[in-house]
Every structure is written in C-alpha cells, then in structure tokens.
C-alpha cells in the first residue's frame, strides 16, 4: 500500500535520517523500518498462502479449535529476524512493531487473509512488564494491522496475570508450564460472537497462544 510522503517527513529525513532496523543503512523516503535489501532477505514463511494447514497451525491441532493461522517471517536466534525483534522488544522502538503490523497487513491482504475477522486481541503483558518496557510489542503490531485493515483492537479483553521469563530459551515442557494459567478473560461481553485475530510477536512452541486462546474461547461463540 503506497503512502503519501509529506514535506515535513522529507524535511525531517534530511536532518534526522532514518536507518534500517536490521543493517543500519539509510532508508529511502519510500522505505519504512526495513531497507529493500533486508526486506527481500528476511525469510518469509509463506503460510498465508495455505492458512488452514501449515506448520504453525499444526502446533494447535488437538489443543484448541483454530480457523486459520499465519506468520510473516521465520524466526531463528542470531538472525536478521531475531535482531529486528530484539530491537522491537528491548531497544525501545515501538514504531518497529507498528511498521511490521502494516507490512503484515499489506502482504496478507493480497490473500484476503483478514476476511471475516472482526476483532484483534494482542497477547498482553503483565502490568509490571508493561511498566518496565513502556509498551506492549504485540499491541504495536496489532495497531499496524488495525490501521491498514480497519479491524478494531480489543485491548482490555484479556489480562496477563503471571510472567516467569522469556520463552525463547526454554524447552517444550518448560514453555507449557511457564504460561499455564497465565491469562484471564476480563471482558467476555466484548468478545461474544467475534472472530478474533490473536497476535503475538514470536511463536515458538505455541504455548503462549494456546494459554491465551483457552481464555478467549470461554467467550460465547468465539472463533480464532
């Protein structure tokens, strides 16, 4: 989706040039967060082309009922993707999340991925974690998707009540234990009858999403 470049944006870019979040090279006025080379190099999953049966969706089979699922990039430690996510989560760059959300929306819209989805729920952080970081990276991604698609965000529907550290260094069983009963449904009326897009920044075993989804599915006639 093309976006207008204002005179103010051009002026700011002259004095405060923007850099690619991965390689650090200067961005052109038409580029956002990623330079063209890094955008092409980041490994896309292609799951959006088969959203009903892919490696991601299979993580949830037998655990929760899920209509479809997709992710934009593969994630590996010490990769370009991991550097991008690290800056988003720990580098105080919430704008990366919103830009990634817009990128996801633009690319997924080509496949009509969002057809029928009526609400977006980002995986929440605990209040303490939110205070420490200053923002929820999943919420920022959700904002970007919402800005392009017009799908509303239900920020208060789900609350995170426990957090026992990052999932990335844990094994499968530790991940499941780490997020067991980690969430609480706080506004069941707002999600009744909704087809929800559940957003997280990184998916490893899928344990976090399963825990969050189990709470959301307590709502009446909810689909994910």
Regions found by a protein language model. Name each.
Residues 1-224:
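Glycine-rich phosphate/pyrophosphate-handling loop used in enzymes and phosphotransfer proteins
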